[in-house]
């Protein structure tokens, strides 16, 4: 038996496609939504001005209840003040509520899309690699996706950026995760065969601005790399073919040199169309 667990606060643009890419390969899907961000603030110092922090443009609860009617899908509210071990906590919640436990659990984000049959391949790979507790995938990060385009764009592969994480429950005494679904021991075991699409740079412009402002606030709280405040205006909203240095971190913009043309393979396109 396999479960999938999602967490979502914003970004409903691609969650239907994401769920459709895995629903035939899992027994249950738990979608946990939060109405509050990890870090709450009423105002934010942004571009040398103090502004009101915007309201989440997505009514996530309403969207989920309207679009997901399958008996496989369970929708729950969950609020927290840190993403640290969030997936581990979410698994504990559903495991305590269900008598029958799965052999595998998949931790997913709402902007991640598997290719057709790719989750089955990932499951087989983890099964055969008996020494691993979990396995993750690298990501093809699509830049400003447009369904009408034959050619879309992507950024170069970021080799240490983990995608969805599949855990083998019988090999794990307790699931402890970092901010993502990867193990808190920081070791990432990447699949040799499977990559997924990440659509996180392709949300609508209102959601992208909200995501950007959350990153500005959250980076200050956790002491992460300072966010380039002009990224949204100059790099994303105002992007064209000549735009370079796309990383959001101030001082590290060159880590993503530029976006380049990319024809999305059919195994992913079956869910995007």
Model-inferred region functions:
Residues 8-14, 172-173:
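Short beta->alpha connector loops
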Residues 3-6, 31:
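Short hydrophobic beta-strand elements that form part
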Residues 83-95, 103, 111-273:
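Catalytic-site signature of metal-activated, phosphate-bearing donor transferases
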Residues 11-44:
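Short, well-formed alpha-helical segments that are part of the catalytic scaffolds
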Residues 2, 34-104:
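Active-site-proximal specificity loops/subdomain of glycosyltransferases
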């Amino acid at each position: 038996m396999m479960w999938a667990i999602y967490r979502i606060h914003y970004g409903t643009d691609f969650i239907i496609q994401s769920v459709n890419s895995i629903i035939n390969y899992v027994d249950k899907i738990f979608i946990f939504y939060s109405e509050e961000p990890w870090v709450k603030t009423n105002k934010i110092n942004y571009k040398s001005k103090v502004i009101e922090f915007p309201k989440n443009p997505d009514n996530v609860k309403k969207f989920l209840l309207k679009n997901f009617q399958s008996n496989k899908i369970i929708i729950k509210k969950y609020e927290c003040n840190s993403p640290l071990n969030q997936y581990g906590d979410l698994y504990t919640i559903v495991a305590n509520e269900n008598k029958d436990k799965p052999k595998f659990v998949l931790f997913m984000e709402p902007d991640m899309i598997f290719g057709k049959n790719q989750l089955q391949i990932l499951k087989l790979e983890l099964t055969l690699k008996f020494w691993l507790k979990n396995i993750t995938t690298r990501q093809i990060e699509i830049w400003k996706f447009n369904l009408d385009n034959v050619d879309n764009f992507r950024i170069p592969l970021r080799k240490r950026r983990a995608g969805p994480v599949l855990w083998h429950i019988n090999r794990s005494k307790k699931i402890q995760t970092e901010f993502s679904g990867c193990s808190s021991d920081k070791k990432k075991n990447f699949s040799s065969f499977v990559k997924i699409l990440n659509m996180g740079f392709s949300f609508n412009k209102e959601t992208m601005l909200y995501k950007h402002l959350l990153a500005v606030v959250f980076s200050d709280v956790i002491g992460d790399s300072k966010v380039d405040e002009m990224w949204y205006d100059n790099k994303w909203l105002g992007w064209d073919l000549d735009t370079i240095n796309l990383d959001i971190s101030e001082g590290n913009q060159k880590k993503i040199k530029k976006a380049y043309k990319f024809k999305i393979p059919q195994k992913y396109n079956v869910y995007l169309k």
